[in-house]
A protein has these predicted regions:
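Bacterial N-terminal signal peptides
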Residues: 11-20
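Bacterial N-terminal signal peptides that target proteins for export
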Residues: 1-9
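Active-site rim recognition segments
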Residues: 453-579
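Acidic low-complexity segments
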Residues: 296-421
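Lumenal/extracellular ectodomains and adaptor appendage modules
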Residues: 26-349
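Alpha-helical transmembrane segments
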Residues: 590-606
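Cytoplasmic C-terminal tails of single-pass
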Residues: 606-619
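Active-site neighborhood of thiol-dependent amide/isopeptide-bond enzymes
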Residues: 380-467, 471-473, 488-499, 503-506, ...
C-alpha cells in the first residue's frame, strides 16, 4: 500500500491577459498579487469535508488592468490509487455539491472537463469582469469530498493537498518588467468537539475563534508535502477470520471417523492477532470455533493456535473479536527512540538477543556488494539513529516506484536487490529493501505484517500490508512504514493499522498443517481476514482473552513444551500414530481378554486345588 494522498495536488492554472491602462511604467514592488486561499472544513462525526478555494486577483499597480477575457482553470484531483469505480462515485459526489460564485455570492458560469480516472476534473471559469486596482477579481469554488478524510470511530485523519514541486511564488514578466506575487494559503478548520490532536505535519499555527479551531500551514512547507492532522488517541477494530480447511483424506469414510474422529484428523496451526507494546495493542475474543487445542506465544511474541478438524471433509475455523490500539496525544509524544549512533551501537553490541535480527536471508541480501555500498553511504556522517532511519526512508522512496498492477495481481516476492535494480515493487519490497539496509548497517530489524489504511467498512479482498520494525533499547520495537511515500515519514505509534504477526526471517506466514495424508502444497486459499473500525460502544470486559482458552489460564511460551498437545498431534497426524490409535484398542482388548482368561484359569486352578485338599482331609 502506498500513500493514497501523495498525488492529491490542487493544481492552479491561470489563463488571462494583461493590458497596460496607460503607458508602461516599471513598478516599484509587486504589481499584482494573486491569492489562492484553500480551507478544508470538517465537522466532527462526518466522513466528508468541505473544500473552499477562494481565488483573489489584485492589481497593485494602477498602470495596469486585466480585461474581462481569458479564463481561470481549477483542478479537482482524484485519489489515484482508488479503483475506477470508486473514483467515478466520488466525482459524482463532488460535482453534485460543486458551486462557483463571485465575492458577493452570485453564481458564476463554469464548464466541467472530466479527465481519465486518476487525472481529476478541470473546472473552467471565464473571466467575468475587468480587474483594476480599484476592483479585485474574486472566485469562490466549493465542493464536498471524502478524499481528505480518513475516519475510524473517533479517530480522524485530515489530509490536505500538497503544492507541486514546480510551484513559483513570484514571477517577473520579461516584456513589461512587472512583478506578480503568488500566495497559496491553506487552512484546516475543525470544531471544538474534535478529539485530541495526536499528530500534525508539517509545522502549523493554530487559532481558536467562535468554537472553531484553525490550523494554518506555511506555503513553502507544502511543496511536495501533504498537510496532515490526526485527531484521536484510540481506535477499536473488529476482525473476522475464516479459514476453510480442505479435504485431504479420501480413504476413510465419515461414518467411521464420526465414531472415532482420530481416524481422520488434521491439525492446523495458524497465527492470531497479537498484542504489541508500542500501540498498547490488545485483543479480545468474541467467539472461536472450534475451540483450539492449544494456544502459545512464539519467540517473536506471535500468538499461534492449534485446531483439530476432520481430514475427510471440508470444514471451517471461524474467529471473531476486537483489537484496540492507542497512541499518545501530540503534547505527550516524544522521540524517546532517538539517540546518538555511538550510544545506540554501544548499547546493543553486547546483546545476544539481537543477533537473529542482523543476519542476511534470501530476500534480505545484506552481504551483496551493492547493498553494502548503499548502506555504508547512507549511514556515513549521520549523527543519530533517527538521521539514519530518515536517510534510509528517503532512499527507499526515491529508488522504488510503487507498482499498482503488482498490488492487484499475483504478488511474487523479488527481494531487496532486484527491487533496487528496478523490479516491480509493493509494500513487501519497500520493507525488504529497508530491512536489508538496516541490517547491513548493523541495526537490528524485522518484518511486520498486518492490515493498514483501515476504514469503518472492510473492503473486498482485504490484503495484508508489510512494514518494518527496528529494535531500540529502552523503547522496544519501533515501527517504520517506508511504503508511505512522503517526507512525513510513518514512524512510531500508528493507529491506522493493526499488527498481526512479525518475522525475523523470510517467512510471511505461520499457517501449518500436520497431517497423515500426502499434501504437496498448502496454500492460503480459503483464508480470509476482514478488519474494520467500530463506531458502536463495545463492552470489552464481557469478552474473552487468549488465556481463557488455555488449561492453565495463561498463554505459554513456545520454550515451555506442551507434552499432551505434542503427543496428541503426533498420534493423530502421522502414519505411525494412526497405526497406534487403530491397533491400540485391539491390543488393549487382547490384553484384557488374556488377563481375564488368565484370571479365570487361576480361579479354576485354585478351586480344583481346594477340592483336592478337602478330599485328602476326609481320607
Amino acid at each position: 500500500m502506498k500513500n493514497r494522498f501523495k498525488n492529491a495536488l490542487l493544481s492552479i492554472i491561470m489563463l488571462s491577459f494583461l493590458f497596460p491602462s496607460t503607458s508602461v511604467v516599471n513598478a516599484q514592488g509587486e504589481d499584482f498579487v494573486i491569492d489562492t486561499n484553500t480551507e478544508v472544513t470538517y465537522s466532527t462525526g462526518d466522513d466528508f469535508a468541505t473544500v473552499t478555494t477562494e481565488y483573489i486577483r489584485n492589481v497593485e499597480n494602477s498602470e495596469y488592468y486585466f480585461p474581462a477575457t481569458g479564463e481561470k482553470i481549477f483542478h479537482i484531483p482524484d485519489i489515484t490509487d482508488n479503483s475506477q469505480e470508486e473514483i467515478q462515485v466520488e466525482r459524482k459526489y463532488k460535482l453534485e455539491s460543486l458551486t462557483v460564485k463571485d465575492f458577493t455570492g452570485n453564481d458564476i458560469d463554469y464548464s466541467i472537463e472530466e479527465n481519465e480516472a486518476g487525472e481529476g476534473i478541470y473546472v473552467t471559469v471565464p473571466n467575468y469582469k475587468t480587474t483594476t486596482s480599484n476592483s479585485a477579481y474574486h472566485i469562490v469554488l466549493e465542493y464536498k469530498t471524502h478524499d481528505y478524510i480518513l475516519k475510524i470511530g473517533d479517530f480522524v485523519n485530515i489530509i490536505g493537498p500538497s503544492l507541486p514541486e514546480e510551484t513559483i511564488f513570484e514571477k517577473t514578466d520579461e516584456e513589461s518588467g512587472t512583478l506578480t506575487i503568488f500566495n497559496y494559503n491553506f487552512t484546516v478548520v475543525v470544531d471544538e468537539d474534535i478529539p485530541t490532536l495526536a499528530k500534525a505535519y508539517p509545522k502549523y499555527t493554530k487559532m481558536e475563534e467562535n468554537g472553531r479551531q484553525y490550523f494554518e500551514f506555511n506555503q513553502t512547507d507544502r511543496i511536495g508535502n501533504s498537510p496532515s492532522l490526526e485527531f484521536g488517541t484510540s481506535v477499536l477494530y473488529r476482525f473476522n477470520l475464516e479459514y476453510t480447511t480442505p479435504q485431504t483424506d479420501n480413504f476413510i469414510p465419515e461414518k467411521y471417523s464420526s465414531l472415532f474422529n482420530a481416524l481422520s484428523t488434521n491439525v492446523y496451526e495458524i497465527s492470531l492477532p497479537r498484542e504489541f507494546a508500542e500501540t498498547n495493542q490488545r485483543v479480545y475474543i468474541e467467539s472461536i470455533s472450534p475451540t483450539p487445542k492449544d494456544i502459545y506465544r512464539d519467540e517473536e511474541g506471535n500468538i499461534l493456535a492449534l485446531f483439530e478438524l476432520p481430514a475427510n471433509k471440508d470444514d471451517k475455523i471461524e474467529i471473531t473479536g476486537y483489537i484496540s490500539v492507542e497512541q499518545d496525544s501530540i503534547e505527550e509524544q516524544s522521540k524517546t527512540f532517538d539517540m546518538s549512533l555511538e550510544d545506540y551501537f554501544g548499547e546493543i553490541k553486547n546483546s545476544d538477543y539481537i543477533g537473529r535480527y542482523l543476519s542476511g536471508t534470501e530476500y534480505w541480501e545484506i552481504n551483496d556488494e551493492y547493498i553494502k555500498q548503499e548502506a555504508d553511504t547512507l549511514i556515513k556522517d549521520q549523527g543519530t539513529l533517527l538521521d539514519v532511519i530518515e536517510a534510509n526512508y528517503k532512499y527507499v522512496n526515491d529508488k522504488l516506484e510503487y507498482d499498482q498492477n503488482k498490488a492487484t495481481s499475483e504478488n511474487t516476492r523479488i527481494g531487496a536487490k532486484e527491487a533496487l535494480l528496478g523490479g516491480p515493487s509493493v509494500c513487501m519490497e519497500y520493507a525488504d529493501v529497508m530491512i536489508s539496509l538496516l541490517r547491513a548497517q548493523g541495526i537490528p530489524s524485522r518484518a511486520a505484517l498486518g492490515y493498514a489504511n483501515l476504514r469503518e467498512i472492510a473492503p473486498d479482498n482485504q490484503v495484508r500490508h508489510q512494514w518494518v520494525q527496528i529494535w531500540v533499547p529502552d523503547y522496544g520495537w519501533l515501527s517504520v512504514d517506508p511504503t508511505f511515500e512522503s517526507a512525513n515519514i510513518k514512524i512510531g505509534q500508528m493507529v491506522d493499522r493493526i499488527l498481526w504477526e512479525v518475522f525475523n526471517d523470510d517467512s510471511l506466514s505461520n499457517i501449518k498443517i500436520y497431517s497423515a495424508n500426502d499434501i504437496v502444497d498448502l496454500t492460503t486459499e480459503g483464508f480470509v481476514v476482514n478488519v474494520f473500525g467500530v463506531t458502536d460502544e463495545v463492552d470489552l470486559e464481557t469478552l474473552k482473552t487468549y488465556s481463557d482458552y488455555t488449561a492453565s489460564g495463561e498463554v505459554r511460551d513456545s520454550q515451555e513444551p506442551n507434552i499432551s498437545s505434542f503427543v496428541g498431534t503426533a498420534l493423530k497426524t502421522t502414519t505411525l500414530g494412526k497405526a497406534v490409535l487403530v491397533t491400540l484398542p485391539i491390543f488393549l482388548v487382547l490384553v484384557t481378554l488374556i488377563a481375564i482368561i488368565s484370571f479365570v484359569s487361576i480361579l479354576i486352578k485354585r478351586q480344583k486345588r481346594k477340592k483336592k485338599e478337602k478330599s485328602q482331609i476326609k481320607r
